[in-house]
């Protein structure tokens, strides 16, 4: 842009900028906000990352995309915790994506709902009819199987150094290893993985973090 307009002013932002990424995308005509709270575009469905670049160049404004979810409430009906309250609104305190990133104890109700999820939840995207036929694969975002679906037991006592070297390049690593380890313990309970009992006992007895110890004790009770 600066090659064509040398004196242009540019400001880019994403996620934590002063503007709402979703509102900007809607006004740019890229899509509309669905009942699941995602911007839904004809080309990508909900499977997109949002960001914007502000420039001091006058453009003709785009027309907003005139579309909607109609009477469809599949995402609301299928949300595991009832976090979607309709019309694109979300109770974040109940959202599994949020819960898997917290660092504290989880209520039993949410431990059961999380199941085998280590980080995040895509249920409201996976069930959305607007995503049918959308290719969610991208050549620049291809993860190795052991990264995409890691073995659970090795996560339990993974060092900070090992965690950073293995997962540090992923967005999900920003919260550190503690939530991932807690979620791995919950997943082992979900799978009733009896072979993990020795490792869970080791964690329950010797891990210095009370939350991890408590979750391990709970998991042992669920498995046995």
Please name every model-derived segment.
Residues 1-146:
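Catalytic cores of enzyme domains
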Residues 118, 129, 133, 189-193, ...:
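Hydrophobic alpha-helix feature that most strongly marks membrane-spanning transmembrane helices
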Residues 130, 134-153, 179, 189-190, ...:
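A detector for short metal-coordination/catalytic motifs
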Residues 145-178, 185:
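Alpha-helical adaptor scaffolds
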Residues 162-166, 193-205, 224:
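Amphipathic alpha-helical scaffolding segments comprising HEAT/armadillo-like alpha-solenoid repeats
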Residues 174, 178-179, 194, 208-211:
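Alpha-helix N-cap/helix-start positions at coil->helix boundaries
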Residues 181-193, 213-223:
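Structural detector for internal amphipathic alpha-helices that build alpha-solenoid repeat scaffolds
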Residues 202-209, 214:
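C-terminal/domain-terminus segments
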């Amino acid at each position: 842009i600066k090659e064509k307009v040398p004196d242009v002013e540019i400001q880019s932002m994403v996620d934590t900028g002063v503007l709402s990424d979703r509102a900007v995308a809607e006004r740019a005509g890229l899509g509309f906000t669905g009942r699941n709270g995602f911007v839904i575009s004809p080309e990508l469905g909900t499977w997109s990352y949002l960001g914007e670049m502000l420039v001091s160049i006058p453009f003709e404004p785009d027309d907003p995309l005139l579309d909607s979810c109609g009477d469809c409430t599949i995402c609301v009906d299928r949300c595991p915790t009832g976090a979607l309250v309709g019309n694109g609104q979300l109770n974040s305190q109940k959202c599994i994506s949020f819960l898997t990133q917290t660092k504290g104890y989880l209520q039993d109700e949410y431990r059961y709902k999380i199941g085998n999820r280590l980080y995040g939840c895509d249920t409201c995207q996976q069930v959305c009819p607007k995503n049918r036929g959308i290719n969610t694969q991208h050549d620049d975002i291809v993860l190795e199987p052991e990264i995409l679906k890691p073995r659970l037991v090795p996560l339990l006592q993974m060092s900070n150094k090992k965690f950073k070297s293995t997962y540090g390049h992923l967005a999900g690593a920003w919260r550190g290893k503690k939530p991932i380890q807690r979620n791995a313990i919950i997943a082992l309970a979900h799978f009733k993985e009896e072979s993990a009992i020795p490792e869970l006992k080791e964690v329950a007895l010797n891990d210095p973090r009370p939350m991890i110890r408590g979750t391990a004790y709970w998991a042992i009770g669920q498995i046995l």
